[in-house]
From Swiss-Prot:
Protein name, UniProt field: Neurotoxin 5
Alphabetized InterPro entries for the sequence: Snake_3FTx (IPR003571), Snake_toxin-like_sf (IPR045860), Snake_toxin_con_site (IPR018354), Toxin_cobra-type (IPR054131)
Lineage of producing organism: Eukaryota, Metazoa, Chordata, Craniata, Vertebrata
Glycosyltransferase keyword on record: no
GO cellular component, one term: extracellular region
Gene Ontology molecular function terms on file: acetylcholine receptor inhibitor activity; ion channel regulator activity; toxin activity
A Pfam match: Toxin_cobra-type
Cell location: Secreted
Keyword Protein biosynthesis attached: no
Function: Binds to muscle nicotinic acetylcholine receptor (nAChR) and inhibit acetylcholine from binding to the receptor, thereby impairing neuromuscular transmission.
Sections of the chain in a coiled coil: none
Family from the record: Belongs to the three-finger toxin family. Short-chain subfamily. Type I alpha-neurotoxin sub-subfamily.
Assigned keywords, A-Z: Acetylcholine receptor inhibiting toxin, Disulfide bond, Ion channel impairing toxin, Neurotoxin, Postsynaptic neurotoxin, Secreted, Toxin
Length: 61
């Protein structure tokens, strides 16, 4: 599986995630604006953090 792993609005980069079946994108707002984190897997998130998990290559941009 290939997942995006760039932060927020940086140029897209990807990572090969061996053994993973999910990519994730999670985002939240703070004093800096909206922060977006992308990567492999499907993590548990704290209340107030939005999470999108998906199962195809580069689906989490």
């Amino acid at each position: 599986l290939e997942c995006h792993n760039q932060q927020s609005s940086q140029a897209p980069t990807t990572k090969t995630c061996s053994g993973e079946t999910n990519c994730y994108k999670k985002w939240w707002s703070d004093h800096r604006g909206t922060i977006i984190e992308r990567g492999c897997g499907c993590p548990k998130v704290k209340p107030g953090v939005k999470l999108n998990c998906c199962t195809t290559d580069r689906c989490n941009n």
